[in-house]
C-alpha cells in the first residue's frame, strides 16, 4: 500500500527518519521517498501489510495509517494514495482546460475501491503554485468526478461537514495527488493540548524537528523565549529525563504556556520562569542546550529592534550555554551577525516553511 505523508517543508529528512524508526518496530518491509515528483513537504511511503496478535491469539491486520497518526510527532497528514500524475503545462492552462484534465484523470481511477456507496464522502483540496484555478474549483471538479464514478454502483452520499471518507486532492505546481485523508480535517501539528494560542506560536512538527537536531543527551534544556511553551511541552511529552526550563518575558504568554503544559499533563516536568532573555545569566548559571523560536518582529511591527535584541541575547547565551543551541528566525542577517560576534559557530543551517514564511534554522555551538 502507498501513502502520501505530509510535513513541513524543509524537514522531510527528519520526518523520514522518524517514520522509518516507527515502521521498523513493526518488522515490515517499506520504502520511503523524500519529495516525490519534486514536491517539498511530502514523503511517499510504500509498505507491506502489518499484523498483530490480539488478546485471543488471533492474527489481525494493523492499520499503518492509524499507527502513524497516533505515533508520529513530525507528520501533518497520512493519506492513502490513490494516484498521482504530472500535468505538464497545467499552470499555463486556462481554467476550463485545467479542470477538464483533472476531471478526466480522476474519472479514470477506481475510487470505488476506497469508499462504499453507502458511505458519505467529501473532497478537501489544496493548491500551491501559479494556476488559473482555485482550490475550490479543484474540490468541486474532483467531487463531481467521484460522484459520477460512484453513481455506476448506486446513489453516492455527499456530506461536506462530517463525511465518513475524506478524499484529498492536491495540485502543487504541475503535480496532482489524490488519496484518502486518514488524518481528518485537523492536521496532526494542531495539538489537542494547545488551549492557549500565542500570536506567533510554533508548529509542533517543527518544534520536534528542532529537538531532533539538538541531539540531546539527557542534559538540561532551555527555551529562553518560550512563548506558549510548544518546544518544552513536546520535549516533556517525549519523557525527556533532563531538566526542562522555559523563560518568557511576558506574563500573559507565561500563564498561557503553563495552561498548555497543564492540558498536556506535563506541567510538573517544566520549570517556568518569568524573565528577560537578554539578561539570561540572572536566571540560569549554565544550561546544556537551548532551543527557541526567536521573535521575528513581524507580529508586533518592530523588526528594527531585532538586531539589538539578538546581539544582547547571544551575548548572554555565551555565558551559560555548554553544548548546542537550535534557533529559527526569518532574520538571517541579524542572527548570523549575533552568532559570529559572540563567538558561536554555525554547525548546521537549513530553511523551513512555517506559516507561509521561509524561516532559517541554525544549530550553533
From Swiss-Prot:
GO BP terms: namely: tRNA methylation
Keyword line: Cytoplasm, Methyltransferase, RNA-binding, S-adenosyl-L-methionine, Transferase, tRNA processing
EC number(s) stated in the UniProt entry for this protein: 2.1.1.256
What InterPro entries does this protein map onto?
Answer: RlmKL-like_Mtase, RlmKL-like_Mtase_CS, SAM-dependent_MTases_sf, THUMP_dom, Trm14-like
Q: Which SMART domains match?
A: THUMP (SM00981)
| One Gene Ontology cellular component annotation held by this UniProt entry | cytoplasm
Q: Annotated Gene Ontology MF terms? A: RNA binding; tRNA (guanine(6)-N2)-methyltransferase activity
Q: Where in the cell is it found?
A: Cytoplasm
Which amino acids does the record list as binding S-adenosyl-L-methionine? 198-202, 228-230, 248, 276-277, 293
Using the record's annotation, list all stretches that form the THUMP domain: 69-182
Known catalytic reactions: guanosine(6) in tRNA + S-adenosyl-L-methionine = N(2)-methylguanosine(6) in tRNA + S-adenosyl-L-homocysteine + H(+)
Per its UniProt record, what Pfam families does this chain match? THUMP, UPF0020
Which protein family is named in the record?
A: Belongs to the methyltransferase superfamily.
**What free text does the record give on domains?**
Consists of an N-terminal THUMP domain fused to a catalytic Rossmann-fold MTase (RFM) domain.
Describe its partners and assembly state. Monomer in solution.
Function per UniProt: S-adenosyl-L-methionine-dependent methyltransferase that catalyzes the methylation of the guanosine nucleotide at position 6 (m2G6) in tRNA(Phe).
According to UniProt, the name of this protein is tRNA (guanine(6)-N2)-methyltransferase
Per the UniProt entry, what species is this protein from, by scientific name? Pyrococcus furiosus (strain ATCC 43587 / DSM 3638 / JCM 8422 / Vc1)
Its lineage reads: Archaea, Methanobacteriati, Methanobacteriota, Thermococci, Thermococcales
